[in-house]
Amino acid sequence: MEKKTIRLIVPDWQAGDNPVYYFGAKILQVIAPKKEGQKEITIPVPDDFKPLERENGVTAQSAVYQQVKDTVSAIDKEAPDKIITFGGNCLVSQAPFAYLNEKYDDLGVLWVDAHPDISNPEIYENEHAMVLANLLGAGDPKLPGLVRKTLKPSQVRYEGMQGGVDVEQAELDRLGVSYAAAKENELDAEGAISWIRENGIKHIALHLDCDVMDPHDFYATYFNNPALGPIPYNAATGHMKRASVWDFIEKISKETDLVGFTIAEYMPWSAMQMRELMKRTKIFG
């Protein structure tokens, strides 16, 4: 019997406080290869792009909480075996990975990202930097309440450590999450597969944040924002070669049972610029 796979389109922009995330999800939906029987479910997200306010130290906390809650409900209704998620920012992985952790007792998580996303409101204000911590039962005190079964640190391997921020590495150590330091700007698929086998993991959920890649090698990342000034202190620039990331994911997908795959933080700056032209051109209404 064929496994049931759904595609979630989650254009959440509030958790990263940047409207371009919204359009990234929409574009990924359009360009993804079609597969008969893979139902697409779009989570409604406001597209007014109004300025956001902080609540309890978190940007738009109520809005992002509701969007995760809506995603949980949509997944529960479908009860899939596998989930593809198009974001949006990194928070979009919370609901599908939490569901898969309930479904599979032997789930492992590979987190491919320039940042480990294990922050909390005392470290950073945007929810997308807390998602892995939320899944581990830490992070934003409000959001882990939507995770019915938290991940154990032993289930998670963070791929793409590239120096990063000291406080993030300290949190990884505090939470007990294993991580693989990048060598020569390439990901180590063999190392990841060895970790999977050594830990008795049978199913994999893989999270890809596009910012793990060198912005000169892959354009649609945070660091190619045309309006970006000095790089923020808490932003680690990706250095991974795109070909290495593609090879890593292909190998994992062929040699493991990949039950969850998220593409997050695909940031189509040129599409946003084109949209601005259309908004300013009278014929569009």
Predicted features, each with a name:
Residues E2-I84, V92-Y104, D173-G285:
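Catalytic cores of soluble, metal-dependent hydrolases
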Residues G139, R157-G164, M240-S244:
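A general structural motif
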